[in-house]
Regions:
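Active-site rim elements
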Residues: 56-70, 113, 133-143, 155-160, ...
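Histidine-centered active-site microenvironments of extracellular/periplasmic hydrolases
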Residues: 8-9, 16, 83-134, 144
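Beta-strand elements within well-structured catalytic alpha/beta cores of enzymes
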Residues: 1, 67, 71-74, 78, ...
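Short alpha-helical functional segments enriched in proximate histidine and acidic residues
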Residues: 77-84, 88, 151, 155, ...
Length: 272
């Protein structure tokens, strides 16, 4: 699985990205100053390096180099598969979908890794290749991975499944842009991050909020959730919150910080 730590790839892919030639992500040292406490608790990853450490140690460029090398290695391997498909008897009846289960922070928000609900962790590639899609295009509208299965059903001309929570992306692929659409990511019980064409709104299980104007602040640096003029917008965004949240289970060996050691009962009591 690449790119995934440990970031191993053949040397030729590392050679594409000399550390001293790389442009590193932007970083705001006091980026967390306007965040609610719960956001800091969730984002804290004690096992992972911080951006400050990466700067002081001089390792930041090497970390980025390794990540980019793995991305290029994967890109080449995908090309091998697609070339084989094009030269096979199945090219006219095969659908290919490429996606990732999460993004990755490379120091932009103070640390490295995933496990947050900001854009670096929640944004992933999603690529469809199908005989029914004859136009190469890039679509800016945010969608959800829940939409992959309904889209495959649509592309395969199968009857829709009414139990699916997602929706087919075929209309979107055919240029029917929905400017009101919202995509949601949930991390931990009742912590939701949603995005539309202009804003990212985050609503935590204790009622804390973050709001970013992506047109003015695409790097999500300045939390404007406390601006009274945006209360109506936040109320409208909250209408998209899931009505059901599955209780989480404790005891996992993969718990990475104290926040996730709490039980569902403790969460519900905290909200009262």
């Amino acid at each position: 699985i690449r790119p995934h730590v440990p970031w191993y790839a053949p040397k030729q892919w590392f050679d594409l990205y000399p550390p001293d030639k790389l442009t590193l992500p932007s970083y705001l040292p006091n980026d967390w100053d306007d965040l609610p406490e719960i956001a800091k608790q969730i984002a804290f990853k004690g096992m992972m390096p911080t951006t400050d450490w990466a700067i002081e140690s001089g390792e930041w460029s090497k970390i980025v180099q390794a990540y980019l090398a793995c991305v290029s290695f994967v890109d080449q391997q995908v090309g091998v598969v697609l070339d084989a498909l094009e030269n096979s008897a199945y090219k006219d009846n095969t659908i290919v979908v490429l996606w990732s289960d999460h993004g990755y922070e490379l120091g932009e928000k103070g640390s490295f890794g995933k496990q947050t609900i900001w854009s670096e962790s929640t944004r992933v590639p999603l690529v469809f290749k199908s005989p029914k899609i004859d136009v190469q295009q890039s679509i800016p509208q945010a969608v959800e991975l829940l939409d992959v299965y309904p889209t495959l059903i649509d592309l395969a001309a199968l009857p829709p499944n009414p139990t699916n929570e997602g929706k087919s992306l075929l209309p979107l692929i055919n240029q029917q842009i929905d400017s009101t659409a919202v995509a949601i990511t949930t991390y931990g019980q009742n912590n939701h991050s949603m995005i539309n064409m202009q804003y990212r709104y985050i609503f935590y299980e204790n009622g804390a909020e973050e709001l970013y104007d992506l047109q003015k602040d695409p790097e999500e640096r300045y939390n404007i959730a406390n601006h009274e003029a945006l209360d109506v917008l936040k109320t409208d965004m909250r209408k998209n919150l899931p009505k059901i949240n599955v209780d989480w289970k404790v005891g996992s060996s993969h718990i990475i910080n104290d926040y996730f050691k709490r039980t569902s009962k403790q969460i519900k009591n905290q909200k009262k």
